[in-house]
């Protein structure tokens, strides 16, 4: 959706535009699913096999399976989301969160919430729809109860989920009549229910010897399967609940976290902590194909398989598994290697920069709270995680240089600076210890400036060349050619000349009464934009430090990122207030606004596509692209 200009008469001379529906930018490059070691993560696909639904941070993402760069985000949950399931009709999604709330919402229209229901006073672990798309059973960890059955439109009780003594991990409803349901949990029990209304029928407590993580009825309703931490797979009659037997003893070498059926009900797939995904023939009770994610002998815990779905309605035999790292693995039956691996961020994106190659290829680079750095192809919206010896925690800044074939330097709260080879998409292997926790990073003619609270370190090829002791506590740094700007918590900006291994103070600017939080030079270096902790943005001439504009005050909290377009007339800013503003230097009273661009805050903004679009990243771990129109 384009951001367009419009009039706001109540503001007199000020003209602004507000994006009517911020949930529909031109593109959403979605966060990957949130995962927790030792817990299953639920994946769901719609009846046509076109979209994937999953929980990530406090959002739910609906993602195109064939084009993962196309996604939709639901942001009405107030706390960490845990599960999302499409209704069989395909018109609605039910999603749960860590506070025990289930929300039902429209997934084909405007995303309007149709109902909000309190199920348990704890985490929702799973939920299931009946075949009529009328009833929902939601289960999890509570105090008074571990699950509840409701009608989706009214929340009225349509049964009782009883029989469990510990949290329920998974639930499934038979899609045919007579209605049946099954729930499994930490008490090693499978409870079978008759419905509707759903009520306890029988309990199976002597088959599994450890936590049961997953259960599912076959699409034709004939068979029920359960899997768990004891690495066992049990089959039951889908109508009566009677045990049919166990298959696959000893096949998996780790906990089995998830199970999903093929549409023909003759096969199902399992995902395990042993890093394998296996297809099973139900009648033969044997594995027909297995994938070892990461290869044989792989010891990377992040490759544990914690979720899987076999999308119905497709003819290409595609199934999708989830790694603990958040990677979505596209596996095709009959093909030994993954067809595709979808990568991205699971945690809050904390830094963003751009890199343009000599061949014209444009990439975005993002860093997140967990130390992950990803490269995004702007043309396709696909991400690639940078391989090698990565940071272990919060990425505080990224900056590009033209060294060699291109480098991206990153600094993080592990107090190190590392470099990435742009072409190879790998860390170069060199890292240097910093003198303190970094606040930001900038490039001045291939000299790297790293800001910490006490000083500015100057590095070349990743090696320290010198340092500059600031007269205030440093909060931000920016550079253009041989000029640097240093922002402080005393609301001062110091302009310095950069020469080799030293900085020479040139001009001091007292910008406001608030700490400086973001700095950006225009592309020709003539202007400097300064953002502060209260949401104000001011523009100064670099040559003499004179004020050019002080009218950009629409943000209501700390400005986190500022970027100029190539002609130096427009500025984009992002802040913790979740909003993005595009400002005009030639018409300071003319702006564009995107409200609620990123849930819980915008942390990075950049111009792409020759200045016709904006890329943004934020606390929701997503990257979004916005079309800009109407600003002069």
Identify the role of each PLM range.
Residues 603-632:
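Blade-level signature of beta-propeller repeat domains, shared across WD40, Kelch, NHL, RCC1
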Residues 27-34, 69-74, 111-117, 156-161, ...:
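A short beta-strand motif characteristic of beta-propeller blades
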Residues 31-58:
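Beta-strand-rich domains and repeat architectures in extracellular enzymes and scaffolds
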Residues 32-39, 75-81, 117-124, 162-168, ...:
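WD40/WD-repeat beta-propeller blade N-cap
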Residues 2-38, 67-69, 335:
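A short helix->beta-strand "capping" segment at the edge of beta-propeller domains
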Residues 43-49, 85-90, 128-134, 171-179, ...:
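Loop/turn segments within WD40 beta-propeller blades
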Residues 55-56, 96-99, 139-143, 183-187, ...:
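Conserved strand-to-loop turn within each blade of WD40 beta-propeller repeats
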Residues 60-64, 102-106, 147-152, 190-195, ...:
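WD40-repeat beta-propellers
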